[in-house]
Swiss-Prot record:
This is Transcriptional repressor NrdR. Residues 49-139 form the ATP-cone domain. GO terms for molecular function: ATP binding; DNA binding; zinc ion binding. Negatively regulates transcription of bacterial ribonucleotide reductase nrd genes and operons by binding to NrdR-boxes.
Amino acid sequence: MKCPKCGSLNDKVLETRQSKEGVVIKRRRECLNCGYRFTTYERIEEEHIEVIKKNNTVEPFNKEKIIRGILLASKNRPITQEQIKQIADDIEKYLLDEGKLKVSSAEIGDLVKNRLKELDPVSYLRFVSVFDGFEDIKDFEEFIKSFEKKI
């Protein structure tokens, strides 16, 4: 660690303590060149997911957008807030576990669709109709026919 007083890279750690939450490590150090004592803090750098939108703009992943989309699709349906939050948490965890730090909005939409299909077919249909941009009744009819074939 570079000494803030003389700039030397030679130091020794005198004391190490972990925070109560276990997320920060505090180290007391002494410069071997000038004897100056200083404190450093270490914490895990959190990974951040970036979403590539349809228009190729990039924005930070926002779990609340997933929750809002599912809430809208599942209005007046037998899906709890806890289930919706769990879906959003599971999608975020999946992306981080897979190391997908840059992901398309289409892929996120597909993950939501897959979960809703298992949970509630009506909410699934509502979500797909908005996400895939259904424009008229014919789009619904075609989708329902293909959905029924898969069942």
